[in-house]
Amino acid sequence: MKRVSEQDKSSMAQAAMSFIVLMAVVSLFNDMTFEGASSILGAYETLLGMPTVWLTAISGAGALLGCSLRMLFGYLSDKTGKYWPFVLIGYEIDMISVPLLALVPENGWALAVVFILSEKLGKAIKKPAKSALVSFAAKQKGEGKSFALGEALDQIGACVGPLIVTAVFACTKSEPSLRQYHLAFLFLGVPALACLGLLITARIRYPKPENFERSERKEGIGRFKITPAFLVFCLGGAIFAMGFLDSFSLLNKDILIKGVIDEGYLPLLYSYAMFIDALSALFFGFLYDKIGFYSLAIATLLSAPYGFLVFGASTLWAIFVGLTSWGIGIGACESVLLSGVASLSSKENRARSYGFFELCYGLSAFGFSFLIAYLYEQSSLAISLFILLTIVASSILFIVAEVLHKAETPKPIKE
């Protein structure tokens, strides 16, 4: 009987890993689409005539819209226990928004805002439920390495997406124009369709991913309890969001203004940052399973100087170093922050916990996006110093969260 039990566990673990990999490939094509668009979005918005204050405000408003609604959709996912419908609907809205950017006419930046925000809406609908489904499977193999694998494959797509855009610009062989941007957005519709096709395949093959994790209670959704460790963790994430630009738009604009590289090659810089992102996600994700949130503190400290290197420097090599620092922060946070929520929450409230965390993150990103825009207009020193101080403060809070989490975790009883 014991042998059968071990075989069942092995089979369950293999199925869980297959599901994680399949969802990671879905994310690969999703990021290929989204990051390909992100690599030129700042320049596209500038070409359409969008003012700088609107550029940063839309980035923050998108974060606010997406993250504030994630709490609601996270609650609904947990309450109904129907995670897949939210994932499917969210991905459909998300993926169709990028090719629609090809329909924006000259000086039509207001219409572009609609499609940008609709993409954020799609993410809000899908993200808590999708993260919850992956976290259920991750309990079989370890949260850190599971989310790290997903983030690494994400970033393969994030590297390829900008290369697609670069190829479109190179093949047209003319000065960057609205037509080139439209063609690029249309080509990104191909990976968008691949993403949706694979997602439907995942739904058919794994209709109940929540069965990968054993339930801690018999009843349905329980009271949403915020532990001290989770509260400090969310506070750390919110402070990190104050100064860490998770959008490439402002960095893109600043590099473009400095003229250190031709506009057509800007996506290559973004692709490089996403490559660093992938390596960072793998390294710090695996490290998370060994040392917990200390890994996140290390990663955030490594990303702290990116403001001085990108905004404060005017040489290409300094910008490369700055984007390396920025990529480390993006990769570590994308994998370890997701792992952290899974570690600090119960199965029954997993999607709601993701929604709450991302609400804190999004409100902070939106609230301080105007300050970031103001500091950028004032001086490179002002924005760089603000970035440094907020990231260092967040790293301290992540260390505190790890200490509290250890204190809250029951020690195993020795027989």
Each language-model region and where it sits:
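Juxtamembrane intracellular "pre-TM" segments in multi-pass secondary transporters
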Residues: K2-M17, Y206-L235
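Cytoplasmic membrane-interface "Motif A"-like loop-to-helix N-cap segments
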Residues: K79-Y91, D289-T300
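Glycine-rich segments within core transmembrane alpha-helices of 12-TM secondary carriers
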Residues: A148-V165, E358-F368
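Symmetry-related core transmembrane helices of the 12-TM Major Facilitator Superfamily/SLC fold
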Residues: H182-I200, I383-A401
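Helix-to-loop junctions at the C-terminal end of transmembrane segments
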Residues: L69-K82, F169, S280-G292, Y376
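C-terminal ends and interior cores of transmembrane alpha-helices
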Residues: E92-E106, L302-S314
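Helix-loop boundary and gating motifs at the non-cytosolic
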Residues: D8-L64, V232-G236, F240-K258, L266-L269
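Intracellular juxtamembrane helix-capping segments at the cytosolic ends
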Residues: I125-A138, A332-S345
